Regions:
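Extended alpha-helical coiled-coil "stalk/arm" regions
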Residues: 28-57
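Short, charge-rich amphipathic alpha-helices with coiled-coil/heptad character
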Residues: 1-20
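Long amphipathic alpha-helical coiled-coil segments
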Residues: 34, 69-98
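Terminal, compositionally biased segments
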Residues: 2-7, 93-99
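Short, glycine/alanine-rich amphipathic alpha-helical segment
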Residues: 48-73
Length: 99
């Protein structure tokens, strides 16, 4: 894992672009998986007693596991992108002697 605190502002901006690209692609895959989940729910809703049981059953599928993994990665990326944004702001203010 890279230490973002040692990156220059241009390196941080480039890293942020790469993360944003990954975030976008993961979001596209998430949409596909959510559509699959809707089809799964439609197919198996009558065979389970509750929505929670249906959700647990979905989470045991490969696609359900992938969706959970993507959700966790997206949340992590949101925090990292926010940290990079803050770090860029601090570095820019330091460059202007405003800190």
């Amino acid at each position: 894992m890279e230490d973002i605190t040692k990156m220059t502002p241009s390196e941080l901006a480039n890293h942020r672009l790469q993360l944003a690209n990954f975030y976008s692609k993961a979001g596209e895959r998430k949409v596909q998986l959510m559509k699959l989940r809707a089809l799964y729910y439609e197919s198996f809703r009558e065979s389970v007693k509750s929505d929670a049981a249906l959700e647990r059953k979905w989470e045991l599928t490969n696609e359900g596991l992938e969706l959970m993994e993507i959700n966790m990665k997206l949340k992590s990326l949101e925090h990292k992108l926010s940290a990079i944004r803050t770090l860029l702001e601090v570095k820019n203010n330091e460059a202007r002697n405003q800190y």
